[in-house]
Design a protein with these regions (language model features):
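A short helix->loop->beta-strand "cap" motif at the edges of active sites that frequently abuts
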Residues: 10, 67-76
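Glycine-rich, charge-decorated loop segments at or immediately adjacent to ligand/cofactor-binding or catalytic sites
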Residues: 78-98
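Short, positively charged and aromatic/hydrophobic N-terminal segments
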Residues: 326-327
Length: 333
């Protein structure tokens, strides 16, 4: 796309990730309002991963806030849409308390494309500047290439990463690492203070197997230190509720390891008092289960107002056997 604009002579500037494309770290695409003022159009092409706390998605929402402040001087916004690599399945709840900045009021795993998210955010913020969404079906590349052919970010190297990110992204704000700095981010979970585990110790979930393992991150938290924990191995073709399973696992670690802690930013990212109460051992899983079911249904009703394609977001049905701490799921699309 850059080459096309450059050949036509209408490319003014390119806003890239702050660091190298796949460098481990917290990448963002940033710009200043003054850089936007003289432009006639801003074209956004990123691959969203379907979870509300993905950095580049938040950067697009921040861009929209800046365009809104420019008023009549704001350039038009063009979104080159892509399919959601984690599909239309939703997980989680709409933020019930003040959450992270530039995060739309959507479920943790929202089931929308970036174009649909922009459509929603524009409606909720009352955006007046022109917005154009170029359909994900408009080009051969979008129709023929898988949405994860090019890695969206350094910590999202492939398809499995996006399926795990709704829950896995929350580990970043705890004293466990989700395998950042390894070849399998969000599949490996552990820390130096965790003792070697047995599979039967951990809460299990439908759609995934847990394999005890050790790993040494090359970057990020615990870089160069040997960590013990487990690997989440997804079962092909089976639905897996990453967020619910992650909450189960976090509560287990809180009960068994005093060194396991939540950072202040964790609660802002979670943005749900009911889920917070569960992690603090104030309520049981049955309450969380019913709460999440109702919230997912509520989000789907809202999301349907903003979809741009034929298929709509849907939820997976799941139930638990508390004695075994097992979560079963059946996709309901």
């Amino acid at each position: 796309m850059w080459d096309i604009f450059r050949e036509r002579g209408n490319l003014v500037t390119v806003f890239n990730p702050r660091e190298a494309e796949l460098t481990p770290g917290t990448n963002h695409i940033v710009c200043e309002a003054d850089q936007l003022r003289e432009l006639s159009a801003v074209v956004v092409e990123i691959q969203d991963v379907g979870v509300r706390y993905f950095n580049y998605t938040k950067d697009v929402m921040q861009l929209m806030e800046m365009l809104a402040l420019l008023g009549d001087e704001a350039p038009s916004l063009y979104i080159v849409d892509h399919l959601n690599p984690s599909g239309r399945v939703v997980e989680g709840t709409i933020p019930a308390v003040a959450g992270e900045m530039f995060v739309p009021k959507v479920a943790h795993r929202h089931g929308l494309t970036l174009g649909e998210l922009v459509n929603l955010y524009a409606s909720e913020t009352g955006a007046k500047f022109p917005i154009h969404v170029i359909s994900a079906m408009a080009t051969d590349a979008n129709r023929q290439l898988m949405p994860w052919t090019i890695a969206p970010a350094s910590d999202i190297p492939g398809l499995f990463s996006s399926y795990l990110y709704s829950g896995g992204g929350l580990w970043n704000n705890t004293t466990l690492t989700p395998g950042i700095g390894t070849a399998r981010p969000y599949e490996y979970i552990g820390a130096p203070f965790v003792k070697p585990l047995r599979p039967e110790e951990l809460p299990q979930a439908h759609g995934a197997l847990l394999r005890p393992c050790s790993f040494t991150p090359a970057a990020g938290r615990y870089a160069g230190e040997r960590c013990f924990g487990f690997q989440i191995m997804l079962v092909p073709g089976e639905p897996y509720h990453s967020l619910l399973h992650t909450l189960h696992l976090m509560r287990w670690f809180r009960e068994h390891y005093s060194a396991f802690e939540f950072e202040p930013a964790f609660w802002t990212k979670l943005a749900d008092p009911v889920l917070e109460a569960y992690l603090k051992e104030e309520i049981g899983f049955d309450v969380v289960q019913e709460h999440m079911k109702l919230e997912e249904q509520k989000w789907i009703r809202k999301a349907k107002r903003y979809i741009l394609y034929d298929d709509a977001p849907c939820r997976m049905k799941w139930f638990a056997i508390p004695k075994k701490c097992t979560i079963f799921a059946v996709q309901n699309c």
